[in-house]
Amino acid sequence: MIGAKTRVAIVGGIGYIGSCFASFIKEQNDKLIVTVIDNNKNNHVIKLLKKIGIEFYFADLLDRHKLTEVIAAIQPDVVFHFAAKTSVSESVHNPLKYFDCNVIGTLNLISAISNLQKPIKLFFASSAAVYGQTTNSYISEEIVITETQATNPYGLSKFLDELILNAVAKNSQLQVVCLRFFNVAGAILPFGNFNGNTTLLIPNLVKAFLKQTPFFLYGNDYATKDGSCIRDYIHVYDICNAHFLLWKWLNDHRQIKFETFNLGSGIGTSNLEVIDIAKKVFYPSRLNLEIRPKRSWDPAILVANVAKAKQTFQFKITRNLKDMISDERNFYENFYNDAY
């Protein structure tokens, strides 16, 4: 049972997944006291959130003093931590930026939460990138991960965060759940991915169809069925619902100190298969596809084994890849430009 007056802090709540989640939980329980913390001053998203009764605090994870002040003012019972640098390619070229924001920033948040000296549930947005290159077709949480597996600094930063959170949770009043996201797509309208520089495949594919600009496919010579990367896609709605289900599950399992779960569909789809589905959504529009060399930091296959989530908190997928692409199209055609 989730109390009506529970105080919720969503860190990184102006971003894509954070803002969708803020909207989702207010829809589930309008009595929750929800506050968003972010260093992004996207006024359009802030206005959308305020319309549904969500407050906004400006704070940067790297400003430890300000972050501590904000957390103390909110006094959250539950914290959802979505804030991070997330571009794999940028992390390869600027690893220090990623360790600074994702690792030091998370440490600062843990410190601010710990200062409250009360029981707090912390849900951390991790990533499938922690698994790096693996020979397993369906990746389970039981796989032993080491720092040498990560194929990029982004994945390594998330792995280090998980290690830190596990160590802290053992001797604190925190209950921590790390959620390893696979490839998130779709929208919960009017919220979606307002990041104009996103590196995610589906938003860029949708924009290429709408604007009739080139779409770059990196690699068609992987050891896969059609030569392109295989990934696991999950709708942002199902990501949000999984967090809500897990929150209710954790309320009934107060002895749990630390857990990890994969969040994906459990279905592998190649980049070329994604393009084929998008062609059907956008028919008769054509795609200007350009093949570029594969990138060294991209694993050939990343697909989730989601058996643990299904068995533990009845996780299920409600939307498919066509839904994700259609929702992204609706978002970019009817809502995206409102922010600019």
UniProtKB/Swiss-Prot annotation:
InterPro entries: Epimerase_deHydtase (IPR001509), NAD(P)-bd_dom_sf (IPR036291), UDP_G4E (IPR005886)
Catalytic activity: UDP-alpha-D-glucose = UDP-alpha-D-galactose
Protein name per the record: UDP-glucose 4-epimerase
PANTHER family assigned: UDP-ARABINOSE 4-EPIMERASE 1 (PTHR43725:SF53), UDP-GLUCOSE 4-EPIMERASE (PTHR43725)
NCBIfam families assigned: galE (TIGR01179)
Essential cofactor(s): NAD(+)
Keywords: Carbohydrate metabolism, Galactose metabolism, Isomerase, NAD
Name of encoding gene: galE
